[in-house]
Amino acid sequence: MLNNKIDFSKYDPKLWFAIEQEKKRQENHIELIASENYTSNYVMDVQGSQLTNKYAEGYPGKRYYGGCEYVDIIEELAIERAKKLFNADYANVQPHSGSQANFSVYTALLNPGDTILGMKLSHGGHLTHGSSVNFSGKMYNVISYGVDENGEINYEELLRLTKKYKPKMIIGGFSAYSGICNWKKMRFIADNADAYFVVDMAHVAGLVAAGIYPNPINYAHVVTSTTHKTLAGPRGGLILAKNGDDILYKKLNLSVFPGAQGGPLMHVIAAKAIAFKEALEPKFKTYQKQIVKNSKVMVERFLEKGYKIISGHTFNHLFLIDLTNKKITGKDADIILSKANITVNKNTIPNDLKSPFITSGIRIGTAAVTRRGFKENEVSRISDWITSILNNVDDHNNVLQIKKKVLEMCLKYPVYI
């Protein structure tokens, strides 16, 4: 196991070195990538258990291999906890990732060439919502909706496109949107075309579990998610549904296995079970509330410093900074901030004129820093450090001075040590 329990530094020094350096990086960097988080020691320990040895094709009670009596218990625990956490009556915990979950749902409900309607990647959507470089953009006829001039989902455009193109599926959810989605309105629009409404809540699953972001389960035909990000579990996928029928649930199960995957990763499913248990505890809700508080404080601080925030606010764990008026690209901001041990990611903004490899913005998320104990005071200071660096990109001494402050803060709030 890699959490300092077995020393294999002499057996494989190159691998040991890389892992040790990554552990140090996580301890000594302020992590503001919105899709990243720190999982618990319980989750990491379970993922390094003997469960990694077990093949278990099929579902509990219906396996293709023998010796599955204990992994059946584990998967059933994960399923029941997921259903309880999100108020669902169906859960599939086998998808290896969020993208795999989406692929499985699409292939269960659609035929190749069907029309889908998803959020533009450049406006905050995800690759799997219809990007031309992704399977979703290759297998299906894609129509895209976006945000309006205020950075909010354009529901009028969504309704107009739905009436015009009659999609088989409308996809809700995002990877870079700081607002609250009106799931009820989106389901109403989907019903106008007799379309499936599928929600990818990967980014806000933790907030949904804590009851501080609207739960799509009562409006979507199917909900997908990752189990990391704000949920703070292992890297993996999840499919949920409510008020469906056995025909739908059977389609979904068959689409995951044998449709998209073979054997499930039982060590990861066990880690999901532990993460769901953690998310059912009262302190998880406190953590999620603090994530949003920290996000709002950072937005307010950036606005005070003259920075433009897409939509001008945040109601979740993330927000986008438009750097156009700062004469710096997202790529360059990413690079210069990393020199001070502050990790962000470059991100396109709505109607961006720059390529996704350059971008005019950066995305900031507060799930990871909140996990290590940062509160309003700390994230306010971090916002000041970021603006100081971006306002003086050629002042290398300033970067070094801020890096020292970053290291001091990280030492005060360790992740694992």
Swiss-Prot record:
One of its GO terms (biological process) is tetrahydrofolate interconversion. It is found in: Cytoplasm. Its cofactor is pyridoxal 5'-phosphate. Keywords: Amino-acid biosynthesis, Cytoplasm, One-carbon metabolism, Pyridoxal phosphate, Transferase. InterPro entries: PyrdxlP-dep_Trfase, PyrdxlP-dep_Trfase_major, PyrdxlP-dep_Trfase_small, Ser_HO-MeTrfase, Ser_HO-MeTrfase-like, Ser_HO-MeTrfase_PLP_BS, SHMT-like_dom. One of its GO terms (molecular function) is pyridoxal phosphate binding. Its EC number is 2.1.2.1. It comes from the Bacteria. Pathway: One-carbon metabolism; tetrahydrofolate interconversion; Amino-acid biosynthesis; glycine biosynthesis; glycine from L-serine: step 1/1. (6S)-5,6,7,8-tetrahydrofolate binds at residues 121, 125-127, 355-357. The record marks 228 as: Plays an important role in substrate specificity. The modification N6-(pyridoxal phosphate)lysine is found at residue 229. It catalyses: (6R)-5,10-methylene-5,6,7,8-tetrahydrofolate + glycine + H2O = (6S)-5,6,7,8-tetrahydrofolate + L-serine. GO terms for cellular component: cytosol. It is an enzyme of class 2 (transferase). CDD domains: SHMT (cd00378). Homodimer. Catalyzes the reversible interconversion of serine and glycine with tetrahydrofolate (THF) serving as the one-carbon carrier. This reaction serves as the major source of one-carbon groups required for the biosynthesis of purines, thymidylate, methionine, and other important biomolecules. Also exhibits THF-independent aldolase activity toward beta-hydroxyamino acids, producing glycine and aldehydes, via a retro-aldol mechanism. Belongs to the SHMT family. This is Serine hydroxymethyltransferase. It comes from Buchnera aphidicola subsp. Acyrthosiphon pisum (strain APS) (Acyrthosiphon pisum symbiotic bacterium).
